[in-house]
Amino acid sequence: MLRKDIIKGEKMKFIRKDVINLTLPILAEQLFVISMGMVNTMMAGHIGKEAVSAIGMVDSINNIVISFFSALAVGGMVVVAQFIGQSNIKKANAAMKQALYSSILISVFITLLMFIFKRSILSFLFGSAEAEVINSANIYLSITLLTYPLITMDLICNGILRGAGDTKTPMKITIFMNVMNVIFTFTFINILKFGIIGAALGIALARSIGAFIVLCVLLKGSSVLKLTKLKKFKFDFTLLKPIFSIGVPASIESLLFNGGKLITQVFIVGMGTISIASNSITSSIGSMLNIPGNALCIAATALVGQHMGKSETEEASDTLAYITKLSTVSLIFMALIFLPFSGLAPRLYTSDINIINLSRNVCILYALFIPIWSISFVLPAGLKGAGDAKYTMVTALIGMWLFRITLGYFLGINLNLGLIGVWSGMFIDWTVRGILYLIRFKKGTWKEKQVIERVASR
């Protein structure tokens, strides 16, 4: 018994080391990304509440597309991670190329569709918003949607690098891109007085730079990955099948899940500009609170994928359990720090007292419920790394459509609780999904999933 405890202790020591080494660069990256995003929102806030509302509305659309490609990138990340786990570098590089080319092709198609129907989409979703808000939203969407292929390239390449265990390179690229974003946005908004056009141009130029840099990194070659023979390419369905077996369910989950979030945004638009602006501000503050959780989600997918590639199912389970606990403790710590300043934070975005008061109340609720977030998001991120993407998809959709949307509408609209009611529906969704993911994790059936042909455990 003592010997088993010693072995278990040694194993956990290596797990902690792997998690910390992989997570710290992601954490630094997330901190910088969210901070720069908050600065951008603050700068837009000084254009006017109409600009904040327009950006919040358009970002709810952009986030659906970005989340779709982030989810598709998970397929490439998991497959590359599992090949790296097997030390099969040739297959890892081939999978990277397949994931990149196929995703860019899909992104170009989506960009063309969105550009053709952009005005109709805004009118359909947010027709009840003020005319000035809709006009600003049309300008912002027209510019930002042209960057979808660049975002896709950035997400796929950085995701694959993380899957290979390299989190420092994506961190450096993302930090540089976000610094440029703030510089461009400040120049266009505060110096050149371009208004909402400046906000859109700033983010578009920064994304272009980020995509170019990460592509150059892979063309030059990292420690294990290198993109070669760009003109020589044909689809390899033996590699695309495992990539899309993870990526497609994850993308469907993301599309329908974020589509549900968009529906809740439509509820909020009907509540008026104060609620729209408060929702955008609270989302921005919530993103800052949730930095540790988001970083550990990425680490969970990569590390579980690598262990499953080596057929180390127990190590995968121990790693995911440790990451989930670490995330929960980190989020509780963030919430405790934030609560005393919940009234001050919204003042960084606006001077409108009505928006400040509503934002403060929703932020307090967010901080109280955030400890539940880990079992709702970190656990399924690890399950996807093992290939259990279909279960996470179905569970997420149940939570979103039965609780966040239906209950959010009932609380927010029928019971007239407004924005607080809509967000309360989201917190109940977190709770239900978290319980379902926890049951799945404890049962252990996810360990039987096979994405690529496994090697014997070493």
What are these regions (language model features)?
Residues S35-S53, L122-A131, T187-F194, L255-M288, ...:
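Helix-terminus/linker motif at the lipid-water interface of multi-pass membrane proteins
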Residues M1-I26, V80-T147, I191-V248, V304-F369, ...:
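Short alpha-helical transmembrane segments in multi-pass integral membrane proteins
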Residues I26, Q30, T41-M42, V78, ...:
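Transmembrane alpha-helix boundary and packing residues in multipass membrane permease domains
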Residues V52-L112, I151-P170, S278-S342, W373-A396:
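Small-residue-rich hydrophobic transmembrane alpha-helices
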Residues K11-M42, H46-I47, N63-G75, S107-T111, ...:
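N-terminal transmembrane alpha-helices
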Residues K49-S60, A137, L141, A200, ...:
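Small-residue hotspots at the loop-to-helix junctions and early N-terminal turns
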Residues N21-G37, I143, A206-G210, V214, ...:
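Transmembrane helical elements of multi-pass membrane transporters/channels
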Residues A73, I143-R162, P170-N181, A199-V214, ...:
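Short runs within selected transmembrane alpha-helices of multi-pass transporters and secretion channels
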